[in-house]
Amino acid sequence: MHFHFGLVEVFYKATTMNYRKMIVRQKAMNLTEAVYVATRKLPPAELYALSAQIRRSVVSIPSNIAEGAGRNTDNDLRHFMTVARGSATELETQLMICEMLNYLNSNDVAPLLKMLDEIRRMLSALIKNGRAD
């Protein structure tokens, strides 16, 4: 069955979500790929610093979505979606730092921030509404 939360559509399967079918997870995976491409533009000096931190942040988003979906309670789901949302906010700040330092330009950063905003809204809906049993 699936539910609509405004523009946010979230899929559920029994008491354990099929995380691979979750639209928010799919969008987070797309963001991860896009961020990896963007971080290739950072200077070599940032390879083990800012670039590595950005990649950890972006990987944390779909990873926590999957872990939360694999749990059996709304409290667990909400916890991991909250962690994923926090990682999204951390990533937003890191991307803004890249733009401020002229490592990435606004054409690189703006689409990533747009993707992040949509993912955060979807995560907020999951945090608010939990899962349907």
Report residues per predicted region.
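Short, C-terminally biased terminal segments at protein or domain edges
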Residues: 1-133
